[in-house]
């Protein structure tokens, strides 16, 4: 019944172990205030639940256009970035043409490419998690139809060199995934709205609205018109559109303040983790850290026993014994620091 292609696929897995402190999914640890949730109840009262949502997300596009400083016609609203990735792979080039992907990176690029049967052209990363120029050149020589660049890269946390992204743009359609833009400030949006050969993806998930599943694909107006032909009708729910629009319109300053707190915690947490024996902490431009330890399975399980959930990413290429840790609230980060110190004492006595 299923195709050979589907039989070979591996499902994307997330960490679901229940823990008191969740530092595994790169979420904003701050929930909406109760007063804001009460305001959203009023928003819900105005929703006609018997009607389909606006297929063009008109009002939300207008709100996002102000946030991203582009025109509404430069935006397609998606049900999370994953939907945008699928449309891009379907719409750019032919299905038998390859996808350029740095490795390791966000796994969904590979998952969706494999689901569609598209060849994958890997670009190895060096010890600083920058693209290896030799393997990059080899990948480009295979003439991929599209490239996906997570910038900052998930799970390594670093920004890629501008010169490498510029080289990729010269050879193929380039998608810059800026899911973590708010934590670094580096963007290619101004290029994307002028260049028909590139696009930018954004999401509301990492800034505190993960439950709404709202993403945005940004490009030239002509590009958005064409790629929108692939979009499923009513792809973003009425409730997600209405709530995202209300929160961004009325409470974006609160979200920006939370981001500032997380960036401050990023500096503090980096110093604290670096002082713990047996842990190598990599620099990060995102809301998470990548650490290297001697035994990731042991550390990961030990943290779970202490009620702290992190992400063991040892299954990714070249990341054996690496763990990704989301930046939490101060008290959560303190609990993490203390737990790792206790584990380190047990291991290195």
Curated annotation (Swiss-Prot):
Q: What class of enzyme is it?
A: transferase
**Positions of post-translational N6-(pyridoxal phosphate)lysine modification:** 206
What Pfam families does UniProt report for this protein, alphabetically?
A: Aminotran_1_2
UniProt-recorded name of the protein: Histidinol-phosphate aminotransferase
Biological processes, Gene Ontology terms: L-histidine biosynthetic process
In the record, the note on similarity to other proteins reads: Belongs to the class-II pyridoxal-phosphate-dependent aminotransferase family. Histidinol-phosphate aminotransferase subfamily.
Keyword hit for Transport: no
Name its pathway: Amino-acid biosynthesis; L-histidine biosynthesis; L-histidine from 5-phospho-alpha-D-ribose 1-diphosphate: step 7/9
- Top-rank taxon of the source lineage equals Bacteria
Catalyses which reaction(s): L-histidinol phosphate + 2-oxoglutarate = 3-(imidazol-4-yl)-2-oxopropyl phosphate + L-glutamate
For this chain, one GO molecular function annotation is: pyridoxal phosphate binding
Keywords, ordered alphabetically:
Amino-acid biosynthesis, Aminotransferase, Histidine biosynthesis, Pyridoxal phosphate, Transferase
Q: Subunit composition?
A: Homodimer.
Its Enzyme Commission number(s) read: 2.6.1.9
Q: Which organism is it from?
A: Hydrogenobaculum sp. (strain Y04AAS1)
Write down the Gene3D superfamilies for this protein, in alphabetical order: Aspartate Aminotransferase, domain 1, Type I PLP-dependent aspartate aminotransferase-like (Major domain)
The answer to keyword Transferase applying to this record is yes
Necessary cofactors: pyridoxal 5'-phosphate
């Amino acid at each position: 019944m299923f195709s050979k292609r589907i039989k070979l696929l591996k499902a994307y897995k997330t960490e679901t172990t229940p823990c008191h402190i969740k530092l595994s999914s790169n979420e904003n640890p701050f929930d909406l205030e109760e007063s804001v949730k009460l305001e959203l109840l009023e928003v819900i009262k105005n929703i006609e639940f018997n009607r389909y949502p606006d297929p063009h997300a008109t009002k939300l596009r207008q709100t996002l256009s102000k946030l991203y400083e582009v025109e509404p016609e430069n935006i397609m609203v998606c049900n999370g970035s994953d939907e945008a990735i699928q449309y891009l792979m379907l719409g750019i080039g032919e299905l038998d043409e390859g996808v350029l992907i740095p490795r390791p990176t966000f796994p969904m690029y590979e998952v969706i490419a494999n689901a569609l049967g598209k060849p994958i052209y890997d670009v190895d990363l060096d010890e600083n998690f920058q693209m290896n120029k030799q393997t990059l050149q080899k990948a480009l020589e295979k003439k991929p139809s599209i490239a996906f660049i997570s910038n900052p890269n998930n799970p390594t946390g670093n920004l890629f060199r501008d010169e490498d992204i510029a080289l990729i743009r010269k050879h193929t359609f380039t998608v810059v995934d800026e899911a973590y833009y708010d934590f670094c400030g580096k963007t290619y949006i101004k290029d994307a709205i002028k260049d028909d050969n590139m696009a930018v993806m954004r999401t509301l998930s990492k800034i505190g609205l993960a439950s709404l599943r709202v993403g945005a694909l940004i490009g030239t107006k002509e590009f958005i018109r064409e790629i929108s032909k692939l979009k499923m009708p009513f792809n973003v729910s009425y409730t997600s559109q209405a709530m995202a629009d209300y929160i961004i319109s009325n409470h974006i300053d609160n979200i920006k303040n939370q981001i500032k707190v997380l960036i401050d915690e990023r500096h503090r947490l980096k110093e604290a983790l670096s002082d713990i024996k047996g842990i190598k902490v990599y620099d990060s431009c995102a809301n998470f850290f990548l650490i290297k330890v001697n035994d990731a399975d042991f550390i990961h399980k030990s943290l779970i026993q202490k009620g702290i959930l992190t992400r063991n990413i040892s299954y990714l290429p070249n990341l054996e014994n690496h763990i990704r840790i989301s930046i939490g609230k101060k008290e959560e980060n303190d609990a993490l620091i203390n737990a790792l110190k206790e584990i380190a004492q047990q291991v290195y006595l």
